[in-house]
Amino acid sequence: MNFDELSSARMNEQLITHPKYNGVYRLCEPIEGKQPDGAWVMGMVYQDVDTLIKYWRPITMFGKFSIWEGGE
């Protein structure tokens, strides 16, 4: 599935910035078994990036070329 298809399929997803990686991430599905309750409701996500990156894996990063996968 390419980026345009993902964008069309997830019109409600938000973009977040992450200062550590100097980029903007488009979020996809929560990491299996990692997301806290209420993390993904009608396309809304945590605004606290420190909390967010523990539970979510971005699929696209704008800025530096990098892929980050979260979960500890």
Language-model segments: residues:
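Intrinsically disordered, low-complexity, charged/polar segments
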Residues: 52-72
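Short, surface-exposed beta-strand-loop junctions and turns on beta-sheet-rich folds
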Residues: 33-34, 63
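Mixed-charge, Lys/Arg-rich low-complexity intrinsically disordered regions
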Residues: 1-12
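A short beta-strand micro-motif
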Residues: 14-19
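Short solvent-exposed strand/turn elements
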Residues: 35-55
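Short beta-strand-centered aromatic/proline hotspots
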Residues: 23-32
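Residues that flank catalytic or metal-binding motifs in active/ligand-binding sites
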Residues: 12, 23, 42
